[in-house]
Each structure stands twice: as structure tokens, then as C-alpha cells.
Amino acid sequence: MAGCHCPPAGDCPPVAPCTFSTPFNIGATLAPTGRLLSTIEMSSHRCMFDYFKQFSSDDNGRYAAQFDLLLGTYCNTLSLIRFLETGLSVACVCTRAPDLMYMREGTVQFEIQQPMIAREGPHPADQPIHTYMVKRLCRRSLSAAFVVAAEALALLSEVSLDGTAISTHLRMRAIQQLARNVRTILDSFERGTVDQMLRILLEKAPPAPLLIPLSRSQAEGRIAGQVMRANLVSELKRTVRTESFIMNKTNANRDTIISFLTKMVNCTHQTISMPRLTHSDSKGRLVDGVLVTTTMVRQKLLSGILDVVDTSARVPVTYGEMIISGTNLVTAVVMGKAVRNMDDIARYILNLKEDNIIDRTDEIVRGDDDRPQTAEISAELVTIGDKLIFLESMERRVYQATQVQYPLIGHVDLTFIMPLGIYQKRGDRYARHIGDYAPGPGCNVGDIRIFPPREIYFYNKDNQVISLSLSDAIGTLCHSSFLDVEATVGNLRNGKYTLSCVLGAYVTNPPALPLADASRQFFENIGEFLRDPPRWIDECHMTVEQFLSTGNPYLSMELHPAFDFFVVPGDVDLPGPHNVPQVMASISASLRVCNCNIPLPLCNSDFRDALGQELASTHHKMSDATINAVSATFSDISYPTAFYIIEAVIHGSERNFGLLMRLVIQCIRSYWDNCKRVAFVNNFHMVAFIDTYLCSGELPEECTNVYKDLMHHVRALRSIVRNYTVQTDPLYGQSHEELNHVLIDRTILPPLLWDCDPLIYQAEGMRDRDLYLNVGSENNYAVRPWLELQDADFQRTGNVLIHNRPIRDADRQTFVPHHAQEWTTLSKIYYYVMVPSFSRGQCCTMGIRFDNIYATSQSVIIPDLQPDEEPPLGPEDPRHPLNGRNLVPNTFNVMLHNARISVDADALLTLQETVNNMAERTTAILYGSTPDIGSSSSSTRHMRTFDGALHHGLLMMAYPCNDETVAAGTYFYPVPVNALFACHDHLAAVRDLPGNSRTLLYRAPPVPPFLGANYYSTFRQPVAQYVKESRCGPNEISYALMAGYFKLSPIGLYHQLRTGLHPGIAFTVIRQDRFLADMGLFAERASESYFLGQVSVTKRPHAGGVQFSLTQPRANVDLGVGYTATCTPLLLRNAITDMGNTVQSLHLTRGSPPLLHQEADEFLRKVTTRGQRAAPQRTVPFLGTLMPNLPSGLEHGQMSICEFIPTPVSADLEYFRTPCNPRGRAAGAIHSGEEASDIDDVMYDHQQGDPAYPFRATNNPWASQRLSYADKLYNGVYNLSGASPLFSPTYKFFTPAEVCCKTRCLDKLIGEAGSALASFASDGEVQFKRPIGSTELTEDPCSLFQEAYPILCATDKALLRAYSTGTTDNPETHLAQYLIRDASPIGGCLPIC
């Protein structure tokens, strides 16, 4: 055996003498060719394996010591072999540092000379500037381990050898297994070196979409200042959207991709190191950097995009120096004696004799200035711009078959936004050609595309058209959190307010006065209630833009779609005293009850009209003749006052109607013959009686058809409630129709009562609703069955109500309703729907002076006729009661004659029969109740509504200004019960009002506070304003009003959403999807210095053997004066989530105070979770579930959750066509100034404009304001379970801490980049690392920019499919339907985009 005993290098640990076998004692020829690295590697492997073969000893300690030393040296030698063959080594300056493990910390100082430009002119001469930069070394390490079993250890040390061939074979197997383990360890170090350096470069590589505009702005000097930052951020957003996944985009051709790659490789800074150990092509041109990416991207780049200029590269085969200054002095002094090249490795570590090291053609130059050895390897060198780039992909070479994910394959989370249910402005509802999408044959409802949209269609990841509809929002709206406003009210009460107008916000008891005096007293003292114009009046006259502008002082009170927040006298229980107490102002909240009370700018007249048109298209419509006749009647200022008197005499009594039937027939016929108008249409009882008794031939057919049509339409309106209510069992004795619609609710009275039927049914339907009822200034009421002449007291006050005389004598002794409950329901529909549809607000409820009514109605002149005389045929006959001879002043004959109404003597005689069933006064009724069981929670249980009604009152149509009897208030006086019946013209009947009072009364509907107030009324100003400004006819308005009276409660909304009725609330749909992306990393040449320490081997006992652990300390330091590396997502692989329509259900994720009635709460929880794909199979805990339930199988990927943010239907649709904040207002530090409060002000101070849309404060006041409905729903500050990143994609947009954290990351990065070229003190430390949070720019840009991206969607499939077919000039609008184009980073990347 020949021995080799060469002394080790001075900087290497001593190596024990070892013996090599003859075949391996001389290294193979090492030449500066492509075989150099592989030859070194093969020689090292053979030396190591030869050691295993020739080792023989029975001393375990000797074995262990020599093996540890040789193993460490072996791995230290070859750990860089693979690394030097990769393109990553272009970005590194590798330095061997044996003493690295003893270094506690290390810093390196660089001197940088700033370039100058000599200039002419009077400029002062510039002086050379030298900048000193101090950088800190980052300590790292690599570790690996393996175990040698005790049996193998015995075989290796020959302790267990027995001299047989089997034992020899087993020993050889043990040696081979150990060699495999060692090879695996070496392989892990080789792969680990690549992985570690790749991650080091990624740590210092800001995303290219960010760095490209930053470098451009820096070059132009546009970094400092808030304005410049805003411009920069705007460019950043555009870059992220347009240049992410550039290689997928259908509109990106070869030139576009090359242009982007050129910007990418030019946005980094060159390093301060100019090493001679660097890479070059085969012709000697230096490589400028390395572009590391995935195999897929590499193949695509090489397939016609980039041109390969060379297929081989010369790489250094040496440990390099960090700073070159003629010699290796710095490295030698700081790190010990340098190992410059592989010759030193062969000499010092492998113990190969110098004579046998290399058969070279070049002379070996000794000394510190030796020319570095290079080797030629296969490579793909491409030119990008003017740079030579090493194109590298290590996905298969290094990471394949390992359990480590390739760092350049990452995920990207994108949040998408879709508007659902929004109704466009009138100017945007157009069609380029009405026949583009025409309704099919047989469609008798017209083009349904003119109606408000209820669905949004889009594509999932597998190109299937799916949709979301309004019913999918059940899990959000139909939850008890919809009623939780305690925190909102508490926050509002922290402010300071002035109580300048209490009208509409204050309710009193009716005073103990006659109603005429009480109403007049209010009119005269209106100044105490109406010092300034009421807020609720001003809001109704605002446009959408005005309402959402910063100039709207009331915007801060619009926080919830179902609640009004308003200023009230503090600590005053309602109904309060007649004189408003002088107390501090406070804030109160009231339930809006029904969706028609949403402020008109947020649920505009156009939408309500369209909803009415949609319902009218499939239900009964009144004929044009009916509409013309009734509309003309309601606007007839010459409508006979005698008809009002007859109506008062009948006062809703079916018995009296039967007595006066002849008179009624003649009045109707005469009025119809005179002007083709219909009488008594202001009174439901009269219309119903006429339809029942007089439509069988007694009247002209055309006239009869009007009354029939009216009643038919009333019943059709009633069927709307039935059609849009899910049929199910009653709750707590209340039908679901009653819980769904206000007019079916028994606690709501008609505005005019002619008997006590509504009060009887109200008492039956109260349940736990805490009824408040004040009649004639006294609590509750007493009943008088009927009144005869001798018992009448027309000045009576108090709470006694007359129930009217029943028709059947058997019912005279019992207090029972005259009609079924449905009669009362139809009565409410007639007054609250039909009358406003025709009157358009030009009517008023009136009190009746029955003493004058009866005096006039009984003042009838009837000539005597002999029994054998023929009755007179007309007024020309002197015997006719309307002949001029019989027209005595102040008689009823005169009133009929003046109105050209022809009646005979027999008809007039019937008036005398009414004295046995009289009315004596009009009584004011103030009633109130707490919410029904569908909307009763801990927050709303004490919220009352207060409404007014008149018992034995009358509805006067257009004010008969030419009739002096009415103008003088002889028979009637105005008592408005709510805004629908409060026409100012009728105040002329109140004589001698002060001029100032009359002026003030015109500012708002003059509803006395003892009959309710706007904010406490069931029917508020928005619905009254709507009927005045609607452009539709009575058919459409009636259906729109009927749709507006559906309740805003969780149970009511469940019925509406489930059956497809638009609730007057739109939604912003938010969905977050995850995508798999291929990244590209570019690093400048020699941008990082990489230090490698000595591998240390430790062993410790292990179960059944010995474990060897190898650890190599390493360190790195950045060599740049700026960012020397950048990365970007180049290719979108696929979507991990399904991009689907799985909807959120708050019942599954959110604990919230339940409804007060357990039966209602259980019903709501049951029906809203039914059919949910993520619904649990067991009872949901009170605080929600920890994790959502998963389905048994998945087809399209992980389910992405859609969440719904309630949004006004009149919200600007253009807002959703570009990236926007789902809250409706921009947020984040990137928009704010330098003050500490600026971030909070940007989010919540709506006196400042939205930074993204300065002309308005917000696009959604229900989400953007502090403690608004959506803010409380999704802000993590208020919710611990539901609003969390685990469940909610909206969490990051609503939680202030999350918003501040994410956006400050971008602000910090901009600040650091802006100061990259500033001078640094010698004692400072600068490390250009990827700032914390900049990863979000590629992985979650939406949280960084606080914006969600519009995705391709449309409310009509035809629009969506026409766009998807790729035809040119696709429309974005067709009538009320709209299409949203994809404005996200994945736009054009997937087939659907």
C-alpha cells in the first residue's frame, strides 16, 4: 500500500493520516474545462469511499475522531460544487470563513463615491462626496443528521467480524449504507445551499410591480412629499393590476413581455463590489445578473420570447473574495488565509500531490494575484434589453422529490368585488339597440331587463356560469345582528348636538281639548316645534350626490338601513308633555319598520318606480278609463262638498248606506253624467259598499266598472303579500304575512276609522307588543254601540267611541266587529296605497263638525206632493226639490244645486232616517307599539312607533278653494295624521292663522305631535315625497308602495329574499380567492456576499446507535446601495379556490344576542341555514362554530366564501368598475398625512372627501362610517369570532389595526426607497431587506392597497356571454342590466377573463 502524508493547510484542521488504494491515490487530470468541477467531485467521492473500504481498527474512539474529521472536511469541500454550477452563483461572492462559528456579530463598512456633473454658469463648484455605509452580517446555518446503527458500528470497527464470508459481506453492506447516508447528507447540503441563497435573495427582493415605479420616481426625484407619494401609489396600483401575471394575459404579446422584463432587470441597483470572480459567456462578456424562475416560465420564455445568445457560461471554480483591491488582503486579514481556488482545495484538503494535480497548458502563477480558475458549464444566457442574463430554473434540479416547496411557486390571494341589486341612474339605463336582447315570443310582461336586477352572473374556475342572487344574502341580513345598534347609539351620544327642530322627533299626548282647538293650537304654535327646516325634509330633497357629499351635515346619522338616528330632547319619556322640556339634546334611534322609509336619495324614486312596474307587469292593472276617472276626481277642486256631507252622514255605517242608497245612486250618476268622474272614491267603505250593492245595473256600466276595477285592484295588491311570503306555520299566534308586511299587521290602524273594528283586531294581535293607545287624551277607549239624536253631544270630549249600529238586530247587544279582519286589511291598503297613488299627496285628513253636518243635511226643502200626482221629472218642474223656488239659503238643496247634482225628493227624504245612527265628533287616536317578534331584540325592545288615526274623520281630496263653506271651516277642519295626508292647501280652512305660522307650516307636513312624529311613524317622509315626485302612473305607484311596506326585520327580509322580492337594499359582494403563481426573481451580479464556515460534526447516543449531526455556520451581507434584486409573479398556474358562490352565514360563525322570542329565533336560525353548503350537521353553539363544516367532496377546489355588505340601491355603479374599497371609502396610511390622527380621519371623518373620490364622502354610508351596520358586522374590534381572517374576507378592510398595519408597510417601503441614495453616517447601519409586509404586494395586494378588484360579472347572462365570445365593442349596459369588466390582476389570464 502506498501512503500519502501531505501536511494540511494552515487554516484547516489537522487531518489524520490515511491510506489510499492504488487505483485512487492519484487524482484525475484537472483541466480548466467543463470537467473541472465534476472531476473534483468524483475524486472527493472516491477518496471518501476508499477510506471506508480500507479502514480497520478496533478502537471506536479512533474511528470516531477520524470519521468526524473526514466527514466534516468532505462536506465542507463539496457543498458548493452544485451551487457553483447554478445561475444563483452569479448573484453571490462566496468567501470561506473557517472562524465564522466564533464570530458573535460582524459589520462591514463600505465607501461610496457619489458621481458629479461639472456644469457651466454661476453654479458653485461641486466637491467630491464620499458616503460611508455600514452593514451587518446576518448569521445563518445549515444542519443535517443521520444515524449509524450499533450493529453497523460493530461491523465497521470489525468488532463483530467472525472471519466468515457472510460477516465480510455484511461489513461491506454496512460501509455501503454509510456511504449512501453520507452522500445523502452531502446532497442535502448542496440543495440546502441553493435553497438558502434563493431565500436570501428573496428576502431582499421587493416585488417588481412596486420597484419599477419606485425606481422611475426615484430617478425623476418624485419621492418626497404627500402629493408625490399619492402619485406613486396610483402608479403602483396600476402596475400591479396590469403587469402581474404578464405571461398569461391574452393581450400581452412578445414585445409586451420583453418590455416588462426589461423594466424588471433595469429597476435594480448595481452593487458596490466589482469582483473579478464572476460569470461570463463563452466570448468573455460578463453576465449582468440572473433571472431565476420555474420550469414552466423558463420553457415559455425560451419558446419564442427571449433569444438564447449562448448555451455555455464560464463560472469561477473558487471561493471568492469580498472586496478586491489588487490583492486578497482584506479577506486574508479579516477571515484568515484565503483559499483562492480549487488548486488549494486539492492541495490542502484532498492531499493530492502538486505534481499530479493538473496537466495544464498555462503556467501556474503563484502569489496572491493568481488568475482565478474557471470552468465551462452548460447555461442559457439571454439578452433582456442591453443586459446579459443567466436564465435559471432549479425547480426540478434541486427541489424535485424533496418535501420542500420551491420558493418561486407561491400563492396569491385576491379579493374580488361584485355589485348585486344596484339600480343604475336614469342616464345610464340605455340600450344601443332595443332589439339586441329582445324578449322571447309569448312573453306578455315586456322586457324584464328594464326591472331592477336581482342576480349577478359570473364564471367559476372551470368556466361554468354561476350566479349569486338576493336570496343568498339571507345568511347576512336575516340574523339578530341586524338589530344590534346599542353600541352605535352609545357612540353617537358622545357627540354634542343642538336641538333646533323637534318637529318629527317628539310625540305628545292629545290635549284635553276639542280636536279642532287642539289642532289649531298646534298650527298657531308651530314655531316652538319648527325653528329650523327639519332634517328629514332636507334629506328628501337631496340628490344622491348631495346626500353622499361632505357638505351633508346629516350624513353621520345615516348608519343603518333599518334604523333612523336623530336628535331628541334628552331623558324625556314619550309621549311627553305638550310643552317641549328645555333639556340637553341627545340621540335616539327608531326602527324604520319598512323599506319605504329608507331615505329617498339612498332608495330613489327611479328604483321604486321600476319595482312597481315589475310587479304591475304580472298582476292586475286598472284600466285607463278607471285611472282617468279616479285621477280626475282626486284633482277636482270643484268636487261637491255635498258628497263629503253625505259621506259624513253615512260615517261608514252599512245600515246608513242602505238607507241613503237612493241618494247615493243619484249622486254618483249625476256626477258621472256631468264630468265622467266618480264620487266617494276617497272613502274605502263607500267604494266597498258601492261595489257590493250598486254594481248590478243601478249605475251606468262604465261607472260601475270603475268601482269594480278599484276593488279588484285592492284585492290584487293584497295578493302581493301572499305571493311574497313563504307559507309556513304561524309564530306565537302571528301569521308570517303579518310579520312580513306592515299593512297586514293588526297593530297598524287605518288613518280613518268609522267603527271600532280595527281597534278590536288590534287588541287581538298585540301579544307582547306593549300597546300604547290614547283616545281623546285618555288611555284606551270606551265603546258606545250607536248614537241617536236625543243622546248626541257634539262638544263631547273623552275616549268614548261610537261603534255604529249593526244591521242585524241580533248583534245589537254584543260588541263584535261589523266586518271580518280582511275588511280592515283592505281598508289600510286602500288608504295607504290606493289613495296616495291617485292623490300624489294632494289630500288631507279632516276633522268633521257634525253639528253643522247634521244641521245642513236635515235642512232639506221638499215640496209636498199629492198621492195621485206624478213625481217631477227634473229640476225644471217647480215641484222638484232642486227647482229655483225651493233653493233656500243654507239648505242642502242649494249645495246639491250648486254642484249640478240632480236628486229627487225621495232620495232627500232618506236623510231623515239617519238620526237613529249618528256620529257626534272626530276623535284623535294616538297608538304605539314595540316591534313584533320578528324584530324584537335587546336593542329594539323599547323602541316604539307612534301613529295617529281619526275616528269619524274624513279624507278630503283636492282642496275646494272655491267653496266658501270649506274655506271657512264650517264643516271640516284639517287634522293631518301623517305625511301622506298632509296637504298644505287644506290649511286654508284654518282661519286667522298668524302669517309667520302659516309660512312655517309650509316647511314640513303639518302633522301635530299628538298624532305622531316622522321618526316614530310607521309611514315617514320618504314615502310621502316619493308619491309626489314619481313619474309613473297609479298602477305602478300602487305596486311600488305595496312593495315599500314590506318590513325591515330579519324574519320579514327572509320572506322577501327567499321569494325574490327586491328589499330596497343592494349588496356589495366580497370574495377572496387563492391562486398558484410562478414567480420570477432577478438579482444583480455579485449582489450578496456569502460566507461559509467550517462544518462541525457532533455525535450523541441514539436509540440503537449513534447520531451524527452536521452543522455549517454561514453568513451573508448585502452588497448594494439600493435594492439589488426584485421578484414578481410572472405566470398564473391555476386557481386553488373554486371562485364560486358559497355564501357566508352569520348563524354559523357569529355569536350575537338572539331575538327575544325563542320561537322566532329558532325559526330564523333554522330557515337561514337550510341548504347552506357549509352548514353544520349539528346544533350551532350560541357563540357560533369554531370552524365551518366541510362537504364530503369537492369538485372545483376549496370553497371561497362570499360575504355581503348592504349597500344603497342608488350607489354609484361606476365605483365598482375600477378597484375600490368595499367599505365605499378609501382607507389606509398611504392616503393620509403625517399626523397621528390622519389615518383614523381618512377612514371615518366624512367631513373630508374620500381620497379616491374627493367629490363625495362615501359611496356606502352604511359601511364606511364608524359603528355603521357593516362596520359593526365585519370590524374585528367588535367581534371575536365572526369577523376574523379565518371566516371573513372583509375583515382586512374594516378592522382599523389591520388597515393601518398593512398600509404602513407600503408607506415604509416607499420611505426607505426614497432615502436609498441619501448619505449615511459611518456609525449607521443600512440593510436593504424586503420590508415587513411587502410580501403582501404579491401575495395579498388587496390588503396592502385596501382595494378589491372588479371581476367579470353581469346581471344578465346575455351580456356576459356576448362579452365572453370576444365580439368587439361589447356593451356594458342594456337598460337596467349591467356588465362589469374584469379590472383585476388576473384579467386576461384565465379563459373566463
Swiss-Prot record:
Keyword terms of this UniProt record: Capsid protein, Host nucleus, T=16 icosahedral capsid protein, Virion
Similarity section: Belongs to the herpesviridae major capsid protein family.
TM helices/strands, residue ranges: none
InterPro entries xref list: Herpes_MCP (IPR000912), Herpes_MCP_upper_sf (IPR023233)
One Pfam family from the record: Herpes_MCP
GO MF annotation: an example: structural molecule activity
SUPFAM superfamilies recorded: Major capsid protein VP5 (SSF103417)
Cell location: Virion; Host nucleus
Complex formation: Homomultimer. Makes the hexons and eleven out of twelve pentons. Interacts with triplex proteins 1/TRX1 and 2/TRX2; adjacent capsomers are linked together in groups of three by triplexes, heterotrimeric complexes composed of one molecule of TRX1 and two molecules of TRX2. Interacts with scaffold protein; this interaction allows efficient MCP transport to the host nucleus. Interacts with capsid vertex component 2/CVC2. Interacts with the small capsomere-interacting protein/SCP.
Principal subcellular localization: virion
Organism for this UniProt entry: Gallid herpesvirus 2 (strain Chicken/Md5/ATCC VR-987)
Described function: Self-assembles to form an icosahedral capsid with a T=16 symmetry, about 200 nm in diameter, and consisting of 150 hexons and 12 pentons (total of 162 capsomers). Hexons form the edges and faces of the capsid and are each composed of six MCP molecules. In contrast, one penton is found at each of the 12 vertices. Eleven of the pentons are MCP pentamers, while the last vertex is occupied by the portal complex.
Cellular compartments per GO CC: host cell nucleus; T=16 icosahedral viral capsid
Annotated protein name in UniProt: Major capsid protein
